[in-house]
Amino acid sequence: MAKSKFERTKPHVNIGTIGHVDHGKTSLTAAITKYFGEFKAYDQIDAAPEERARGITISTAHVEYETEKRHYAHVDCPGHADYVKNMITGAAQMDGAILVVSAADGPMPQTREHILLARQVGVPAIVVFLNKVDQVDDAELLELVELEIRELLSKYDFPGDDIPIVKGSALAALEDKDKSIGEDAVRLLMSEVDNYIPTPERPVDQPFLLPIEDVFSISGRGTVVTGRVERGVIKVGEEIEIIGIRPTSKTTVTGVEMFRKLLDQGQAGDNIGALLRGVDREGIERGQVLAKPGSVTPHTRFKAEAYILTKDEGGRHTPFFTNYRPQFYFRTTDVTGIVTLPEGIEMVMPGDNVAMDVSLIVPIAMEEKLRFAIREGGRTVGAGIVSKIIE
């Protein structure tokens, strides 16, 4: 099935397979590429290369394929720990996920944990592939497993009653056996993914935000901040807010330059210098953000989901307890924060993932799903994501 080069005119969506070990995530990934992309065999996907994201090494396999409607980038991880790290660090962003559950086993501990993680890190939508249906002869048993999956999804605030569940066999698809549960099921799955997982809003259509990396003054012109526009568009003459660390203030962008050329606007992905009206060099600093007024607010207290590195990954050698005070690295700067562990959790060991409350000593421009690194003296010891803002 030779395919021509990918058309970039289609909307692009990032997805991934999640679910319990040996339920068939990698086989399904291979089967999807067989019908919608350049076929990648199970072994090619399973031998995932290691990558580093936020100082953490993660094994992830990336494949790409396309349906009539969309172009997809798909990630599959070989080990459970890789999933946890991947979802928390956002190394591979997911606009949606395909949850793979073996019909023979039903939901297992990692099924539950991946659904919880998907909820915590804000994966917007899930479609289910009920795999290995050829191993279950009893239709009632299949119904029970489906019911169990729906209940589990609902428990973690996904719309369990509405989520599409496609029954099939990834192996049958790979081996060209029983077409109804093989090829047909994989095609049906992708049509459900096309229709059920929303197309993400492009960064350029979102409200403007630029994390400040550097500040300097140009004599006779004023104060310039530099950084990469994270989202949205900024036009010369627009009013913006300076948010985080200090009280929020307003200013007007009087100039935008890129590669020493003056522009009338900067947009998501551009590295720009922005000239600000009436801002003193001392009144602004790295770690603050420029943003569209009212679009983002400063906060100090939040709930987070975090992964703590093992000693081998260069992390801590010892556990930590409530009142642990590391630095939290948000976007471009470190801020000290105080950790409170949930009731019933005495300590956190290197290699754990944990839900925790954090209180920062100064406010940071913050939204749910914002990611951060946890550092001690400049060394990364963990990674996390804001799951809920408290104040």
Swiss-Prot record:
Q: What is its main location?
A: cytoplasm
Q: Which domain of life is it from?
A: Bacteria
Q: Which residues bind GTP?
A: 19-26, 76-80, 131-134
Task: Supply the alphabetized keyword list.
Answer: Cytoplasm, Elongation factor, GTP-binding, Hydrolase, Magnesium, Metal-binding, Nucleotide-binding, Protein biosynthesis
Q: What Gene3D superfamilies does the entry give?
A: P-loop containing nucleotide triphosphate hydrolases, Translation factors
Q: Which reaction does it catalyse?
A: GTP + H2O = GDP + phosphate + H(+)
What EC number(s) would the UniProt record show?
Answer: 3.6.5.3
Give the region (G4) as residue ranges.
131-134
| Residues annotated as binding Mg(2+) | 26
Coiled-coil spans in chain: none
Domain tr-type G: where?
Answer: 10-201
Region called G3, residue ranges = 76-79
Q: Where is this region: G5?
A: 169-171
**InterPro entries of this UniProt entry?**
EF-Tu_GTP-bd (IPR041709), EF-Tu_GTPase (IPR050055), EFTu-like_2 (IPR004161), EFTU_2 (IPR033720), G_TR_CS (IPR031157), P-loop_NTPase (IPR027417), Small_GTP-bd (IPR005225), T_Tr_GTP-bd_dom (IPR000795)
Q: Where in the cell is it found?
A: Cytoplasm
GO cellular component terms, A-Z: cytosol
Under the heading CDD domains, the entry gives: EF_Tu (cd01884), EFTU_II (cd03697), EFTU_III (cd03707)
Region G1: start-end pairs: 19-26
Q: What segment(s) does the record annotate as region G2?
A: 55-59
User: Which family does the record assign?
Assistant: Belongs to the TRAFAC class translation factor GTPase superfamily. Classic translation factor GTPase family. EF-Tu/EF-1A subfamily.
**How does the annotation summarize its subunit structure?**
Monomer.
Known role: GTP hydrolase that promotes the GTP-dependent binding of aminoacyl-tRNA to the A-site of ribosomes during protein biosynthesis.
Protein name per the record: Elongation factor Tu 1
Protein species of origin? Bartonella quintana (strain Toulouse)
